[in-house]
Amino acid sequence: MQYSIEINKNTEIFDIDKVAKQAAGAVLMRQGKSVVLATVAREEKQVEEDFLPLTVQYIEKAYAAGKIPGGYVKRETKPSDAETLTARIIDRSLRPLFPKGYTYPTQIVVMVLSADPKVDLQVMSLNAASVALYLSDIPMKAPVCGVRIGKIDGNFILNPNNEELQNSTLDLYVAGVKDELLMIEMRALPDQKENEIFIEAPYADVLTQTTSQNMNELSEDEILEALNLAQKAILNGSNAYEEAFSKHKKNSQIELKNEIEHPEILAFIENNFQKQIKEAINQMAKSERASELNKIAKEILNLEIAKDWSEESVLNTLAKVKRKLIREQILNEGKRADGRSLNEVRPISIETNILPNAHGSCLFTRGQTQALVVATLGGENDAQMIDLLTEKNPISERFMVNYNFPGFSVGEASPIKAPGRRELGHGNLAKRALYPSVDENYPYVIRLVSEILESNGSSSMATVCGGSLALKAAGVPSLKLVAGVAMGLIFEDNKHAVLTDIMGLEDHDGDMDFKVAGSKDGVTALQMDIKLGGIDQETLKQALYQAKEGRIHILNIMEEAAKEIIVNEEVLPKLELFSVDPSKIVDIIGQAGKTIKEIIEKFGVSIDLDREKGEVKIAGSQNEQIKAAKDYIINITSSQKGTKKGSKDKDISGFELGQEFQGIVKKIAPFGAFVELKNGVDGLLHSSKSKHLNLTENQSLKVKISEIKNGKISVDLCE
């Protein structure tokens, strides 16, 4: 059965009961030339633990874009970072709607079978997964709808296609159900149209870089305006899906796990152990470990009254009492477990360039959360190449943020493994926050690595703060400092409290995790995940403005620390950027890359060439090596005589091996001297053959031709 739905500027076509009919729910969705298959499957038996065992996989098939997978294995293998991040977005959007007590292992799989470059696959995939889940026998009150908001020429655009998004200064992805928001991802996109590189002469020795780049931060009011547009579109989409598919939804026969109550244990603990639990909460405010509660549980289990109580029932009841006490203290007293007020940021300390041989580093500590963020600068060859499904060629990622979360940061003895979904998500959020502050024309590739050394909440925002200062410490001309703060929400019986700079305890027992990053002028990135089933605009507005206060407080401290930064120029890579005639780039490369390889090996530098513009970038650790390589390249491009049809260079056909000349030294370079032979034609006398001479310009020398190769002449001294 097929349904065609016109919603939010898109025509969405759904085939149900056509494919994957043994799954609990399945839908084949078409939009433009894109086709995705979304399926939901679940096990019949519940897990014993009290949690939602949900797995979401998003898979882009290479054939969807008419490609064969690259590499030695010609099939799809492990998911790319982009696939993992999309799966994470789908998971975060759908997870809040699963009913309490649902503990069946469940898998949602979204496969991209055909990819239209103009279609937003992230939005399409979420909506397909939402409909598949709604059609299944899993009890869902209504379908989730996802939308994207862009901003072009100052106007908000609903669901921009991929081409429009290239010109947008905003990327806002929102998921919700009816009039409630469940998940938000937002990033500001810097203006790229105004950035220019000026060449002062037709082929200047040095390129002058200038920028009028705008970070395009959004004010809190602009974000709320965009969210209001998104909320209306979500209501429209959610209602449309419900109207179309409610009659096809399977009847739910699923048994939900009832929460096991232990009233006698609860009463005993509340009457006899409240004081100890409050003391334990104060200890837990300093760590994410729950060892203090375990001590209380052991004490209770050793009592005569507890001889028939299980350890699990005591621990679960203790956790409930702890949660209740934390929330009541916040809502009724306006006081948090560590003694802070609701809008208070934990103490901050900052040290920069503590690693003497790293390009730039910052140790950022906020309360019991600590991030060591290290910046490294590199050449174009160091950029990460990413193969996107809808792009014909791999794209070059010149700004990277890697986030590492070792077990010792929370006192656990766990093995250090490859980064998981959480690490990729946190690194991506920090990258989105910092990217607008980095000049698009900055010639170096940048890699930031965040090592979380301690964690008690808000480690991704510590990465943003430390990353912004690490860029400064590496001498990167960032446009503005960027800071981040994590906000929380406690909601109970029509009362609510918004918390600034939440710690792990408040994240675990709270109802919202809302991360906001930006400069003093506005927000560059934000991320919201909700646990209570949705949030209204008024509460969101309060959280945004309270986050602004916290962000500015942090930025004031960061600005003072930035004034003390001493850039370690000795360890920073050196770079020379100049231009040659684009037709000469082939001479620099040489046959099969032989010439450029020789230059790289000879001078110990890396070289990046732009064939179209004639730009040459030379990077290395020593200025002398870079200058020598530059002189060598300029000599190659200026001494290629008659090697190309239509060349205006002087003819060297009359020169022969062994010919002798009384030449004049015209230029001295670290690798040798250029000696004019006749008619303006030079020969290179290598430095290894003239070490015993103290050569000066305009000095007369008797030389003979020792080699003529690729239009270049080499000479030796006559004996």
UniProtKB/Swiss-Prot annotation:
Species in which this protein is naturally found: Campylobacter jejuni subsp. jejuni serotype O:6 (strain 81116 / NCTC 11828)
**Record key words, sorted:** Cytoplasm, Magnesium, Metal-binding, Nucleotidyltransferase, RNA-binding, Transferase
Using the record's annotation, list all stretches that form the S1 motif domain: 658-719
The organism's taxonomic lineage, starting at the top: Bacteria, Pseudomonadati, Campylobacterota, Epsilonproteobacteria, Campylobacterales
The biological process GO terms on file are: mRNA catabolic process; RNA processing
This one is known as Polyribonucleotide nucleotidyltransferase
Q: State where the protein is found.
A: Cytoplasm
Q: What are the record's GO terms for cellular component?
A: cytosol
The record's SMART domains line, in alphabetical order, gives: KH, S1
Gene encoding the protein? pnp
